[in-house]
Amino acid sequence: MNNQGGDEIGKLFVGGLDWSTTQETLRSYFSQYGEVVDCVIMKDKTTNQSRGFGFVKFKDPNCVGTVLASRPHTLDGRNIDPKPCTPRGMQPERSRPREGWQQKEPRTENSRSNKIFVGGIPHNCGETELKEYFNRFGVVTEVVMIYDAEKQRPRGFGFITFEDEQSVDQAVNMHFHDIMGKKVEVKRAEPRDSKSQTPGPPGSNQWGSRAMQSTANGWTGQPPQTWQGYSPQGMWMPTGQTIGGYGQPAGRGGPPPPPSFAPFLVSTTPGPFPPPQGFPPGYATPPPFGYGYGPPPPPPDQFVSSGVPPPPGTPGAAPLAFPPPPGQSAQDLSKPPSGQQDFPFSQFGNACFVKLSEWI
């Protein structure tokens, strides 16, 4: 059967044929729709086994429309898929190219592709198993599986190159294939136009596929750029989302966290009493706020309830629950002892300086 462009008028491509279907049974089936002048089933050159597709040519080109209007078609217990063969010079260009695909132009000898894209490959399927499976559609000349550059493990998709285009047509016609118990998607791979297309992801060479440009099918292997880090369960977490209830992770898009609480400083002078261990009774412990975040600073005329009594004379302040030291009135408690430097509260946040010898 000739494959010249003018000879494709009135011709059907028939895919999904059973392995037992012969040219005689194929011709006999389609003869009910009109006179068949030519019929062929494509076979493997080595094993002479049917490759599962063929071509039928009618004397009257109008018979093609009759066949298409009579779908579905079943032959030898299997659903077959007849499609019209449009001469290459008459193939319409796409008005809107799909994402990640170039505008389709009349194909030349140099732009013909015998390559298919295979997505959703099982993790336990290697190049040998892929080649063995796709050999049923024709001679496989190359198998390329895309690997993660860092982890050196398959990313779940790859490319198969056949010896001829008829093998590509047959493989793509099935669309979904069952490989090692998993549904695998097969699409035709088109060579990119290097002048009009930006380079694809690493490992894609010059071949494009929608799955390489979109995360919808889950084959890109990379999460969106707005996602950072891992949750304790190993799942991707959006930037700023809390992980385990501990607030925003440090270094993931937020400012450095401030100290969780202001230091409490206690100064002592030599005396008969040992230095205090920890904080004096009744004085503050760190406030119960989450990691790295404390309460907002109080206004200048207010004091936080950190357990440290406010200076006497402050409006609204409660009276002290203990007497002042000998020789000093309650009004003088807000002043630093003589000979001591006065440190403003604003310099150390909510810290309070207390000289223990004044309270003993």
Swiss-Prot record:
One GO term in the molecular function aspect is: RNA binding
Provide the protein's localization.
Answer: Cytoplasm
Task: State where composition is biased (Pro residues).
Answer: 271-301
Quick one: where's region Disordered?
A: 73-116, 184-345
- Name one cellular component (GO) term: cytoplasm
Keyword Methyltransferase: yes or no? no
**SMART domains associated with the record:** RRM
**Cytoplasm listed as a keyword:** yes
Stretches with biased composition (Gly residues): 242-253
Tissues where the protein occurs: Expressed in oocytes.
Q: Domain of life of the organism in this record?
A: Eukaryota
Pfam short name (any one): RRM_1
- Annotated Polar residues bias: 203-231, 328-345
Q: Predominant location of this chain? A: cytoplasm
Q: Which UniProt keywords are given for this protein, alphabetically ordered?
A: Cytoplasm, Developmental protein, Differentiation, Oogenesis, Repeat, RNA-binding
Quaternary data: Component of a mRNP complex, at least composed of DAZAP1, IGF2BP3-A, STAU and VgRBP60. Binds to the 3'-UTR of Vg1 mRNA. Interacts with profilin, a protein involved in actin assembly. Interacts with VgRBP71.
Describe the function of this protein. Answer: RNA-binding protein, which is required during gametogenesis. May be involved in the actin-dependent anchoring of Vg1 mRNA in the vegetal cortex of the oocyte.
Q: What's this protein's name? A: DAZ-associated protein 1
User: Per the UniProt entry, what species is this protein from, by scientific name?
Assistant: Xenopus laevis
